[in-house]
Each structure stands twice: as structure tokens, then as C-alpha cells.
Amino acid sequence: MKKTTAFLLCFLMIFTALLPMQNANAYDASLIPNLQIPQKNIPNNDGMNFVKGLRLGWNLGNTFDAFNGTNITNELDYETSWSGIKTTKQMIDAIKQKGFNTVRIPVSWHPHVSGSDYKISDVWMNRVQEVVNYCIDNKMYVILNTHHDVDKVKGYFPSSQYMASSKKYITSVWAQIAARFANYDEHLIFEGMNEPRLVGHANEWWPELTNSDVVDSINCINQLNQDFVNTVRATGGKNASRYLMCPGYVASPDGATNDYFRMPNDISGNNNKIIVSVHAYCPWNFAGLAMADGGTNAWNINDSKDQSEVTWFMDNIYNKYTSRGIPVIIGECGAVDKNNLKTRVEYMSYYVAQAKARGILCILWDNNNFSGTGELFGFFDRRSCQFKFPEIIDGMVKYAFEAKTDPDPVIVYGDYNNDGNVDALDFAGLKKYIMAADHAYVKNLDVNLDNEVNAFDLAILKKYLLGMVSKLPSN
């Protein structure tokens, strides 16, 4: 009896001690703020609508982007050298189930190339493709990039001194990647470079426009972006019209909105197929800088100054790009864990809501790091396939999906003059349109849905008007 009583007392003491831990980890929906963010005017075009369909994204960080490690015996060990765990379909399924519709897969290619032509290892390429397929099979969108490849010797480096080797690297690597994925549809997006910058320079992380080295670097980035676009387009197949992402200096908001940055030209017929790539951990002392390095864990959702730390760069992006119908994706954002869950929930909810109001997509940076004093950007525990901070994710999902937007426009296929009817006037207009020497792609004229407007569409429209085809496509 005494042993039984002692056991029960011991059990109760342990159970009572665990209660605070259980309560501390209990889900708290009340942390998610109720926001009313005024919606900006968003142009209606294919590029903007495409990005809208991506909804919300998640980064498979510290995985294929790893370029060193202590336990690497074969090249596939790079995948686990930083995160410690191999990517599985179960992980991607959990990401999809939580509400993410896009996965960005950062890849560092330079440890896996050989020879003067930068031949990519088939073993590495096959494994990357396998994980891409995990996402594609879930009907998710995928962004594939070149990540930690900014290197004077092994990769590319955006300065005039290294432009010859940089151009060769970018064109060689992207020709191979594009060829491998040429038959993938628009669910796969290519991102030419990740945070291109002058590594080791005093202005590595800030585009100081009074510095001639920085201006030279921006001009080189412009050229490398153009080389990337030209290379991918030249491989043909679905790459001829694939959506592509291009960054400015260090992929910062200022890098993309300064007067020296130029978006690359695209081939005729591609309208708004080039997406501006931006990374923004703003304000950095809260979102990215660890407490041990002088960061802060404070950010007040009701303070106008703190709000402006988010809205200033989004307004700049909106004014230069999305308000003009040029799509933008924030490929990396987030807030490191500083034992400040409530603040991070409010910050990420506010961040996504403000971006959504401006037609900008957000992709959460997740490096699977949950301990220590550094960049604790871990959100999804890849071993348990559970989100450690579900309130943060649910806040992001809430405002990525529920922000007030105009309804998708009704597309009347074959309606050349946009009067709501399809008749002989539209046939005459489409015929004249096709005979023009150079014409842009117009979605509602593509009546056979092959991503081209040509004589085949005219023939189908004729059959429809003659009663030989019962109906045209609809959205």
C-alpha cells in the first residue's frame, strides 16, 4: 500500500510538473490578429493572375543549397549535411495539407559540376528532379534556382572582372537544367540567381549607388539575368513560355527598385512572364538578426513606425512593378524565433496581408533550425512532419487566402472585340490579328488552349460559328 501511495504521489508530481509545459505548447488561435488591410488596385493580366494562383510558399532551406559539411562521403550527402534529414514525399504532403501551394527548392549546383563546360552530375540532377516531382505530383508549384553559387572560382560573380566566366557558368548550368525539365508545365518556375552580390565587399549586403563597384555589379546582374532568360528560352519546349524569376542586387527591395536595375527582355509573345525576385526580412534587427548579435524581439503591430518597416518596401515594389502589371515574388521572408511567438504571429500575418493587398506572393524561409543562438528560421519539423509554430502558419494562410480581392474575370474565348459575344465580327478581327507580323499572346483568343494564337484557333472559331463545334472553352 505504501509503495502504491508513493508511486501515485510521484506520478502526480511529475504530471503536475508537466502541465505548464503542455499549456505552453497548446495551440492558441487568439494569437492570430484580425486585420483589415485596404486592397490596392491590381492590374488584371496573365502574369499577375499566375502569381496570385501560387497563393503562399515555403522554402526547402538548408537542404539542396548546402555546399559543405563534415560527413560527406558521396555527393548525395550534401542534401543532409546542413539539415540532417533527407527530404521525403511525406514532408511535401504535410506542407501541402497545411495550406502552402508553392515550394521553393534552393539548389547549389557548383559542388556538383565538372569540367570546363560545368557538366552537372546526373546523380545530383536525378535527386533534385525526384523532389521536384514530389511537389508536382501534389499539383503544387515549384521554384528551382541556383543558390549559393556566387563564387569567383566555382560559380559566377557579378563584376566586370569575372563576367566572362560568370556568363559561361550561368548559361552552361541553366542550359542543362532547362533541358532536363523542358517538358514540365508552368507549375515549374526557374529563378536565375539567388542574392547576386559582391561577396566580401564593404557593400556586399547593401546596394550603395554612390559606389562604382556596386553600379558595375548591378549592370553585370542585368546582363546575367538576360543571359539566363535567353538560355532558357533557347532550349524550347515549354521553356519557351515558362515563368522565370530575376533578382536585382542581393535580391533586396532596393536592389530591384533602383534606377540602374533593368528587367530582362523576353521573346515576342511572352507578356509578363518575367517575375521580379525579392528577399525581405524587414526590419532586419527583428526579423533576421539574432538577439546575441544585437537584434530585438520586439515589433508592435499597432505602432505606425513598426508597420512602416514592412510597408515602405512593399509600397516601393508596388509602385514600380505590381501596379504596372509586372509580377513580384518575395522568395524569402520570415522572423527568427526569439521566444516571442505572439509577436511573430502578428508580424507574419501583417506581412502577408500587406503583400497580398499589393499583389505580391510571399514564400517563407525555413532552414529547419530550432536550437542555438543563430538564424532560428525553423518552422516545420521535418522529422515529425509537424509545424512547431502552427499559429504563425495559420496566420499566413488566413491572409494569403482570405484577403479581399476582385473576383477572377470571366473569360469569353473567341471574343476578339470584348463585347461579350462571339460572332462574325470576332472572326474577322481574329483573322486580321493573326495576319499581323508581330502580335502578343492574348489568352481569350487561344480557343484551342495550346498557349499560341494562330490559324488553328481561327479554324476552330470558324467551326463554332458554323455550328460544327458546340462550344468554346470557358473559365
From Swiss-Prot:
GO BP: any one term: cellulose catabolic process
Signal sequence interval, chain numbering: 1-26
Catalytic reactions on record: Endohydrolysis of (1->4)-beta-D-glucosidic linkages in cellulose, lichenin and cereal beta-D-glucans
EC number of the protein: 3.2.1.4
Gene this protein is translated from: celCCA
Organism domain of life: Bacteria
Effect ascribed to mutating H148V: Large decrease of activity
Protein name: Endoglucanase A
